[in-house]
UniProtKB/Swiss-Prot annotation:
It comes from Homo sapiens. One of its GO terms (cellular component) is plasma membrane. It is a multi-pass membrane protein. This is Olfactory receptor 2G2. Residues 1-28, 83-103, 162-198, 263-275 are extracellular. GO terms for biological process: detection of chemical stimulus involved in sensory perception of smell. Keywords: Cell membrane, Disulfide bond, G-protein coupled receptor, Glycoprotein, Membrane, Olfaction, Receptor, Sensory transduction, Transducer, Transmembrane, Transmembrane helix. It is found in: Cell membrane. Glycans are attached at N8. Odorant receptor. Disulfide bonds join C100-C192. It comes from the Eukaryota. The chain crosses the membrane at residues 29-52, 61-82, 104-123, 143-161, 199-222, 240-262, 276-295. Belongs to the G-protein coupled receptor 1 family.
Length: 317
């Protein structure tokens, strides 16, 4: 009965997100910087979504998946960053239990879906480069929608399992979360009972949603690189390399930071190091996506200029 009472008290009182409380002078600087990056992220990813929809030349599987990725980035930042900004600005760092619950489900579902979608995009790139004559037959709209749906549903499914298991743990009045967002690993640490099963389940999920997609991307990238080197046309070869390089850059930054967070032993890094890496993963990686794609892929740059020219009624060279 005592454990139940303490657990209920934690649920009613909510949690205290310590965030960057140890760096009071840095919090205001981070607030301004993160606010700017947040606005750039929303603007950049919304631009990619609109351009992909408005420009007929971009009505292709690659840009269909890219618009889904941008939509994911937009939703993730909108579910995480506002709470982070409040945490940095307000002296009171509390978050209601219900708010933490919504925060946990949204961020975990969107983040898990993001882990699957780049692997789907690599599949599209593999068919486009290695099987160009069969591309339109294989990558039809129904398959693209099915692959995108698979990514979304897998993210939602793993979230229902992991988040539910985590929130069933008794916290025994422990309210201080040494992070700036509600995440499964940090909430598991608050539990006052054994968490071996939760940690094992989280590790297995991390393998499935991180190592498996990364392995698939690396293998497909190897086949793509081999096929690109055999292209005789320098223009086509440069175009293929540019597209694949952009995708690999985004993938490397995204998976590199998240693997560091979820698969590195907790004892091998300091708690502050984990916070700053998490901050980079949460804010910076999603801002870089539109920047990298628009700078590296000529079709996106050309379509963006065309859409802006129509909107502004001017001729943009």
């Amino acid at each position: 009965m005592g454990m139940v009472r303490h657990t209920n008290e934690s649920n009613l009182a909510g949690f205290i997100l310590l965030g960057f409380s140890d760096y009071p002078q840095l919090q205001k600087v981070l607030f301004v910087l993160i606010l700017i990056l947040y606005l750039l992220t929303i603007l950049g990813n919304t631009t990619i979504i609109l351009v992909s929809r408005l420009e007929p030349k971009l009505h292709m599987p690659m840009y269909f998946f890219l618009s889904h990725l941008s939509f994911l980035y937009r939703c993730f930042t909108s579910s995480v960053i506002p709470q982070l900004l409040v945490n940095l600005w307000e002296p009171m760092k509390t978050i209601a239990y219900g708010g933490c619950l919504v925060h946990l489900y949204n961020s975990h579902a969107l983040g898990s879906t993001e882990c699957v979608l780049p692997a789907v995009m690599s599949c599209d790139r593999y068919v486009a480069v290695c099987r160009p004559l069969h591309y339109t037959v294989l990558m039809h709209i129904h398959l693209c929608m099915a692959l995108a749906s698979m990514a979304w549903l897998s993210g939602i499914a793993t979230t229902l399992v992991q988040s539910t298991l985590t929130l069933q743990l008794p916290f025994c009045g422990h309210r201080q979360v040494d992070h700036f967002i509600c995440e499964v690993p940090v909430l598991i640490k608050l539990a006052c009972v054994g968490t071996t099963f939760n940690e094992a389940e989280l590790f297995v999920a991390s393998i499935l949603f991180l190592i498996v997609p990364v392995s698939f991307i690396l293998v497909s990238s190897g086949y793509i690189a081999h096929a690109v080197l055999r292209i005789k046309s320098a223009t086509r070869r440069q175009k293929a390399f540019g597209t694949c390089f952009s995708h690999l850059t985004v993938v490397t930054i995204f998976y590199g930071t998240i693997i560091f967070m979820y698969l590195q032993p907790a004892k091998s890094r300091s708690r502050d190091q984990g916070k700053f890496v998490s901050l980079f993963y949460t804010v910076v990686t999603r801002m870089l996506n539109p920047l990298i794609y628009t700078l590296r892929i000529k079709e996106v740059k050309g379509a963006l200029k065309k859409v802006l020219a129509k909107a502004l009624g001017v001729n943009i060279l």
